Amino acid sequence: ESDFARSHPGGSLGRRLLLRVEDIMHTGEDIPAVPQGTALSQALMEMTRKGLGMTVIVDRHRHVMGVFTDGDLRRALDKEINVHRTTIDEVMTRNCATVHADVLTGEAIRIMNEKRITALPVVSGDKTLIGALHMHDLVRAGVV
C-alpha cells in the first residue's frame, strides 16, 4: 500500500494512504470546545462560531467527555428543552467516537462512515482534546 501511495501521491487513494489527520485537523482556537456544566445556549454559540457542526465537551484537564452535534440539537429541540437552563452535560453524546492525530485520513473516513457522522474530536493517547476534523477538511484535502 505505501509503495502505491508513494508512486501515486496525487490521487485521492495516494493521499488517503499518506495524509494523516494531524496534517489537516483544526487546532488551537479553531477547536470547538466547552467545559462540562456549560449552558446549552453558550455551547450553541461556540458551535456556531467554529462552524464544524459540533462542539466537544471537556473536563478541566481537556479530556473529552462527550460531543454535541447538530443532530443532538435537533433531538433536544424535539423535547422542547430550555436552552438557557439546560447544561450541555444533559444533552451531549457520551462515549463519542474520536480519532488520534497520527492516524491516516483513510481511517478517519472509515470511522465517520461507520458511525454516520461528519466530524470527529482528535485526541492524544490519554483522550486529551488536541484537534477537530470535519468531513469538509477531507474533501478540501482531496482525500474523498
Describe these PLM feature segments.
Residues E1-D30, V64-T118, G125, L129-V144:
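Tandem CBS (Bateman) regulatory domains
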Residues L52-G53, I117-A119:
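Short loop/turn microsegments at loop-to-beta-strand junctions
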